[in-house]
Structure formats: structure tokens, C-alpha cells
Amino acid sequence: REINQFNGSEEVKHNLMELVKYLRRSLELTEKLSVSLQDELDFVRTYIELERGRVGEDFVATITVEDGLDATRIMIPSMIVQIPVENAIKHGLAGKDGKKELMVYVSRETNGIRITVTDNGRGYLPQVVSATRGTGTGLKVLYKTIQLLNTKNKSDKIRFNITNRSDGQTGTEVSVYIPFRFSYDL
């Protein structure tokens, strides 16, 4: 309400409202161990909108959920999409010349879903993350969360993999497999 009374341009008002929305959702989601796929993807969309101006006009982001998947009913670890998306933008796409592409794709597998985050940025260089204003904290938290959850689930486990794209492509691909039957109780 107070933002609408702000005497800035419409773009500034919009960005400020998106920032407030992002911060509010960030606080909500980081307090939870699991969230619906829909909530996580909505959060990621807000983050992408905030970063769009900084990354540049030649930034294209797509989020696709395969037909037949009910994103409101599928539970996933909180931040499991947001952290790879943030890393792709910060470390792969920001400052890159030319077209910048970020794709999030959610597909069905036999007993779960696969979430793939792909960019056409610089590629994944673990030793460079800390040198490019990153601390690696997001990935460390993600790995520890997955490890903890996997120890509590005796059958199917979450699988998380980061690779550099091949076949002459540049960029990084993060692939996450999440079983449908998975407990988030610790």
C-alpha cells in the first residue's frame, strides 16, 4: 500500500514490489524443509524478475512443467530450484556477452520427478565460485540438506548433479531427481 504512494517511476515501483514479495517469500520458504513445487517455482519466477534488469535485455528465462504433473501437490526440498537458478544467473550469465538463456524444466520419471536447470553461461568451475563474489554457501546448504534427508529415507533418494554442458555447448546443467514417495520428517 505504501509502495503505491511512492513517487518513483512505474518500473521502480514494480521492482520495489517484486523485491518486497521476494523477501517475504524468502523468509517463509527458508523456514520450511519442504514446499510445493508450485511455491518454489513462483519464488524462482519472482527472483528472475528481480534479476532481469541487472542481467540485461538479452536474458531469456523459461520455466516448463511437463503436462500431467500437479505442481501444487508435489513436495520438494525448499530452495532446491532457487539456489541453482541464483548461481546460474550470478556466476554463469551476469556479465556474459550475447544472449543469456536460463531454462528450468520439470519432467516425470518412473518414481519421481527430474528438475533440470540449464544455462548457456561460463560453465561450472568450483574453484572460481568464491573468486566471483560467491561463497558457495547455497550449494553447501543444499548438499547438507539433501544428505540429511537421504539418511532419513531408506529407499529412493534425492540425487543432485552439476555438470558442464557438452556437445560444444557452453554453460552448466543442474539435475535433481526427487522421488514421489519421500519423507521430509526428521
What are these regions (language model features)?
Residues 1-159:
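Two-component histidine phosphotransfer core
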Residues 102, 170-178:
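Hydrophobic core positions in the C-terminal catalytic ATP-binding module
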Residues 157-171:
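A short beta-strand-to-loop micro-motif at the C-terminal edge of the catalytic HATPase_c
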Residues 179-184:
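Two-component histidine kinase transmitter core
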